[in-house]
Regions:
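Solvent-exposed, acidic/flexible segments
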Residues: 39-46, 62-63, 97-105, 119, ...
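Generic structural signal for alpha-helix termini and adjacent loop/cap motifs
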Residues: 84, 118, 150, 282-286, ...
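Catalytic-site signature segments of enzymes, centered on catalytic residues
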Residues: 80, 154-240, 249-281, 289-295, ...
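Active/ligand-binding-proximal structured segments within catalytic/core domains
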Residues: 108
Length: 515
């Protein structure tokens, strides 16, 4: 997902959840927080899960889900629901492989924590050949922690549109140097490819690949036998959950395949509820699993600490301050308890969530195979609400679905290109627009006349994606965007030997010059 969508939605949900704990008058300074959730309360919340998940799946229509709950180092709940793929018989179980989307980030920060020998190494600059930022000083000083906490200065989702156009990881990381920068270490903007660059640098510095480092450092030692950072492993798993999107008639279809290898550390992990329950036990166990230390406690603890403000408090709604750690959303509730969470969302068909209260030794994993409509977040929020209050105090599905819908709409153009204005001017002859245009960031763009005389087609990307143009007004056309970051119809404006593509111009990089 693009724009502040996922992080805004996730951040608000975390802030709302943090506000559900009962407030109490606290002395100054307040005492350390104490556990508040009893075993009986957890059992009650677990007992509700079957009905909660089933009801939310009926409401949303999401085809499949898999859920795990860990408490006091025990897996209390592990269950699959629904179908791996609509139209087929295969059902979801705890060993069904799902794409994690951005839930990959806390998994990847666990890998890096395992690769480091000292927490201070998070603050070291680790160079990666081919990667630089626009400011040379920032390039020479940006640390792993800066990129893992989205405070490098890169703009929101920098590089994601290049991935949509089909560019590979090497091209994308090399071209991030053209992105404008916000102030270093004081600006928060969620960036999959900044995160990816840091992870790849850690692996390269150790003479290995990110895939091998992940397997050797975390997956194998933790017994996560069905977990991988490679799309091919997900694709080839016979029991994987296909990604689904919602059709206009309310049904769901596996229309798209999402290959996230270019941003593997940020969004390319695939796993099962069973494997993720082991990872959750490791997180709550401070790096220890089944009596064996897998990840150093001190380097792992650093991932759970706030690194930058991501969600300012909102007095009007009572939302709490939210922070971003190293691959984690970090917040504190009214009782002072640390709450860690992260959601994953592929518009092409996946939605996931992890939420945990370390002090309570309680966490939940929710994996789904439908585009983000709030199901994964709502199941997790409802579970903790019941564990803390004995009942659901909020319709979390309504809250989460509204936030995701709002975030999706926020990326759309303010212009309704489907309806030209009254008195729209005609287009010029096709020859006024056809030709090859160049852009240092996005590469070549071609505009060609359709052989049958039906209009123009715009082509973009290394293996050109073709977009039929629809005339709007004068020298302005439009086309329907496609891919993970699609935003509906976007404008294409020709002027003085240039063409500006509206949705590519979010960081003022979307103007192409005619050759």
């Amino acid at each position: 997902m693009r724009t502040p969508r996922v992080l805004t939605a996730t951040g608000v949900l975390v802030a709302l959840a943090a506000g559900t704990a009962a407030a109490a008058a606290a002395p100054s300074p307040p005492p350390p927080p104490r556990p508040q959730i009893t075993d009986a309360a957890v059992e009650k919340a677990v007992a509700r899960l079957d009905g909660t998940v089933a009801a939310m799946m009926r409401t949303t229509g999401v085809p499949g889900a898999s859920v795990a709950v860990v408490h006091d180092d025990k897996v209390l709940y592990l269950k699959g629901f629904g179908l791996r793929r609509t139209g087929e018989r295969g059902t979801v179980d705890p060993d069904t492989v799902f794409q994690l989307a951005s839930l990959s980030k806390p998994v990847s920060s666990t890998v890096v924590a395992g690769a480091l020998s000292d927490p201070a190494e998070w603050d070291a600059h680790v160079p990666l050949p081919g990667f630089a930022l626009k400011d040379p000083w920032v390039s020479d000083h940006v640390a792993t922690a800066d990129l893992f906490s989205h405070r490098s200065g890169l703009p929101d989702h920098a590089g994601d549109l290049l991935e949509d156009l089909g560019y590979d990881q090497s091209y994308i990381l090399d071209h991030l140097r053209l992105e404008p920068l916000d102030p270093f270490r004081i600006s928060y903007a969620y960036t999959n490819f900044g995160f990816t660059a840091a992870a790849e640098a850690i692996a390269a510095a150790r003479g290995t690949s990110w895939q091998k480092l992940s397997a050797d450092t975390l997956f194998k030692p933790a017994g996560m036998t069905r977990t991988s950072t490679e799309f091919s492993a997900f694709r080839d798993a016979p029991d994987h959950a296909a990604t689904h999107v919602k059709n206009p008639d309310g049904t769901w279809s596996p229309r798209y395949v999402r290959d996230p290898d270019a941003q593997s550390p940020a969004g390319g992990v695939s796993s099962t509820a069973r494997d993720m329950s082991r990872w959750l036990r490791l997180q709550l166990g401070n790096g220890v699993l089944d009596g064996k230390r897998v990840i150093p406690a001190d380097t792992l603890a650093r991932t759970h600490q706030p690194q930058i403000l991501s969600q300012p408090p909102t007095t009007a709604t009572g939302e709490h301050t939210g922070f971003y750690g190293l691959g984690w959303n970090v917040s504190y509730d009214d009782a002072g308890r640390l709450r860690l969470s992260h959601s994953g969302a592929f518009e092409l068909g996946a939605n996931t969530n992890v939420t945990m209260l370390p002090l309570e030794q309680l966490g939940i994993i929710v994996l789904t195979n439908g585009a983000p409509v709030g199901l994964a977040d709502a199941v997790a929020l409802d579970f903790f609400d019941v564990a803390e209050h004995g009942r659901a105090t909020t319709d979390w599905l309504a809250v989460a679905s509204a936030l995701y819908a709002q975030a999706l709409d926020a990326g759309r153009s303010p212009t309704d290109y489907a309806h030209p204005p009254a008195g729209a001017k005609p287009a010029r002859n096709d020859s006024a627009y056809t030709g090859t245009y160049d852009n240092p960031y996005y590469g070549k763009l071609t505009v060609s006349a359709n052989p049958d005389g039906s209009g123009l087609t715009l082509s973009l990307g290394p293996k050109p994606l073709k977009f039929p143009l629809t005339h709007y007004d004068g020298d302005v056309f439009s086309f329907e965007t496609a891919g993970e970051n699609a935003v509906g119809r976007t404008g294409v404006t020709f002027a003085d030997g240039t063409v500006r593509v509206e949705y590519l111009d979010v960081n003022h990089l979307g103007t192409f010059t005619r050759q």
